[in-house]
Amino acid sequence: MAIRMIGLDLDGTLFNSRKQLTAHTRQILERAIAGGIVIVPATGRPRSGLPAALADMEGIRYTIVTNGAAVYDLEEDRCIYEKYMDREASAELLRRTRGLQTVQGAFVGPWGYMEEIDRQRIEQLSLVEEMKQYLRSSRKVVEDLPAFVLGEARGPQKLVLMFLKDREGRPIDSEEAIRITGEYAQFSFVSGGVGNIEIMDSAVGKGTALLELGRQLGIEREEIMAIGDSENDMDMICKAGLGVAMANGEEIVRRRADVLTGSNDEDGAAAAIEQYAL
């Protein structure tokens, strides 16, 4: 069957190592859109963190955010699917991991939130400067993150714990954070590929959201293609009719994908779209 919809991860997939959308990749996306293919950015970022390069691209109407916890219709500026976490358990988890060497974040609705102390810690993270700047610009600061989460009308779409590293480059406190998180059966967690864990309701996944959007649009699983590089892309790579892994992807992702393409610094996502969808 012909490909009618493509779910695309951003960091490490559509964007190169400098967090840029190349002119060639943009051209291929525009060709796909002109051919009637539904292009769906699928990211761990919140709605407010969707880069303008994609949010403003003509023909991109839908986006999957926070690892599949929500789907937004950009044209109508509304959420058309959401699965949020339990508020009380989320606040408790944040309190229990607060003393660890991490940068905490909570995504409620379209926004990401953090405390000022964690905003100051961003500089200590082992990230490229473009990603640090994205974190600084896309988070709202609250005085007490667990209390903020508890006081909202609904639970967060996602929590994130980003690990500080020791002199040897090893994540500090990651094992303890994973141990604590593992005690919450109602949650699942994955790595976003940047030295972190991303925590969602156990029913959440990019693949689940992609299939739900396909259902709403009348698109079958066999007509859906997904491209990604990290553990948080596994759900859609495995559930789509055609799952594509980037050459720079994590080993487990490359093993589970149907096919491989070039790296994000080689316009690999564009090459896959050309080969399998155009």
Question: Where in the sequence are the language-model features?
Answer:
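Mg2+-dependent phosphoryl-transfer enzymes with acidic/Ser/Thr/Gly-rich catalytic loops
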Residues: 1-5, 21-22, 197-278
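Short, well-ordered alpha-helix to beta-strand connector turns
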Residues: 3, 60, 101, 156-157, ...
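Asp-based phosphoryl-transfer active-site loop
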Residues: 4-18, 93
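Active-site metal-binding loops of divalent metal-dependent hydrolases
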Residues: 12, 68, 228-230
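Short, acidic loop-to-helix structural element flanking the phosphoryl-transfer center
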Residues: 19-36, 82-89, 142-147, 201-215, ...
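Active-site phosphate-binding/coordination module
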Residues: 20-129
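Short, structured coil segments at secondary-structure junctions
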Residues: 56-59, 67, 75, 183-185, ...
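Conserved acidic, metal-coordinating active-site core of Asp-based
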Residues: 96, 102-103, 107-227
